[in-house]
């Protein structure tokens, strides 16, 4: 029993070290350094969300803010199917669950990524599932996917093309040309600098 306990302790310490190096993401996350950077301007936990109540959008970040009426427990304990059902609600009473989880996945994107990642409606919408879902968005953007997987040369042009794809995915990320949000209003500066994104992308080469 002493040897088993020691082995479990080593495994536990190893897993903790892995989680720290992996920026709190699960083992399923392919690009944790990139995910950690881009989610800084999006969310804090896998349970974060926002929702529409009529024409008003309300948010709950890190357990603080408005509570979506249909959520009776943490978001990450529901199944993918249950999350989709809440995202399909009318924006009138009780309101429509909108952007969900660590990556703030909206309804149409969840359906698309679920199909791409081949995830069941019965899967729990926890860390592993959310990380698998976001992995599935990378191949949809060829410049980003080709750069991260080494299918193109590590040139400045290819790096900037990959960084632009990141800005297209996450509205809080700046474009390489002007560090402004791809999806924001004219002249709106992003909260995540494109140079930081490019540095992280380059670290995967």
Language-model segments: residues:
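Single-pass alpha-helical membrane anchors
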Residues: 1-23
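Cell-wall polysaccharide-cleaving catalytic domain and substrate-binding groove, primarily
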Residues: 16-124, 129-205
């Amino acid at each position: 029993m002493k040897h088993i306990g020691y082995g479990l302790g080593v495994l536990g310490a190893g897993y903790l070290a892995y989680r720290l190096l992996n920026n709190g993401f699960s083992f399923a996350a392919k690009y944790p350094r990139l995910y950690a950077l881009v989610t800084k301007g999006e969310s804090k936990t896998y349970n974060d969300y926002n929702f529409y109540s009529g024409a008003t959008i309300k948010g709950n970040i890190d357990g603080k803010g408005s509570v979506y009426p249909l959520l009776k427990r943490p978001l990450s304990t529901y199944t993918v199917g249950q999350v989709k059902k809440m995202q399909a609600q009318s924006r009138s009473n009780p309101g429509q669950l909108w952007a969900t989880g660590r990556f703030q996945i909206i309804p149409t994107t969840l359906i698309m990524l679920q199909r791409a990642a081949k995830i069941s409606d019965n899967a729990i919408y926890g860390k592993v599932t959310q990380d698998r879902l976001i992995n599935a968005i990378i191949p949809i953007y060829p410049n980003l996917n080709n750069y991260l997987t080494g299918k193109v040369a590590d040139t400045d042009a290819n790096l900037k093309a990959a960084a632009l794809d990141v800005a297209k995915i996450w509205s809080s990320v700046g474009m390489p040309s002007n560090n402004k949000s791809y999806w924001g209003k004219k002249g709106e500066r992003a909260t995540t600098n494109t140079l930081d994104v490019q540095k992280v992308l380059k670290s995967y080469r």
